From Swiss-Prot:
Name of the protein in its database record: Uncharacterized glutaredoxin-like 8.6 kDa protein in rubredoxin operon
Family to which this protein belongs: Belongs to the glutaredoxin family.
Originating species: Clostridium pasteurianum
BP terms from Gene Ontology: cell redox homeostasis
Lineage: Bacteria, Bacillati, Bacillota, Clostridia, Eubacteriales
Domain Glutaredoxin, chain residue ranges per copy: 1-75
Keywords annotated in UniProt: Disulfide bond, Electron transport, Redox-active center, Transport
Amino acid sequence: MIKIYSTPTCPWCKKTKEYLKSKNIDFVDVNVADDMKEREEMRSLSKQSGVPVINIDGNIIVGFNKAEIDKLIEK
């Protein structure tokens, strides 16, 4: 499962979601600006407060990193 922790105003979050959509990859989008529980989960997993944070089957990517995303979705 892929989960993206994002905010509505984050341009890198938008790029991440557009990239996954272009590859026909399903994901869950979580708005951490509104959901405090999810924000705390994101911080616990990534040790970061910036977005996007991408959780691909338990592997955490901070920021939009095509190479890392591709490596993990090809597994």
